[in-house]
Amino acid sequence: MAAFQDLPQSFRDERIELEQAGIADWNRLRDLSDAELSRLARSGRASPRNLKRLRAIAGLVCDLQLPAPDAALLMHAGIATSAALAASTPERVVQQTGRLERSLGTGRPAVVNLFTARTWIQRARQLRN
């Protein structure tokens, strides 16, 4: 996987800590243990909560080959793992992501439609099998 791309500004401290620790791609981040995340959080300004969020995003990026913004949308909508996505329905994914986008007040059309949700769920279920 490529180096971190499209990370929101809210993760800038975590990005700096990860890069200083030599972790510059999604695969390495996905594979970090809780202890390693805690060590990173203690070493600088990165928050444990944001590091865990980034690890969840990394899991979706690596496992499902999703773009980071789509993985972040799923994670923030409460679908943080490929197993959770595999257990969901397309309607539920559209509902949860749409609710999040409306609460953020982006004013743009929904990113996730039934076709997209179905595609993501199929990938997640293939991973599970």
Give names to the regions the model predicted.
Residues 1-129:
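C-terminal extensions
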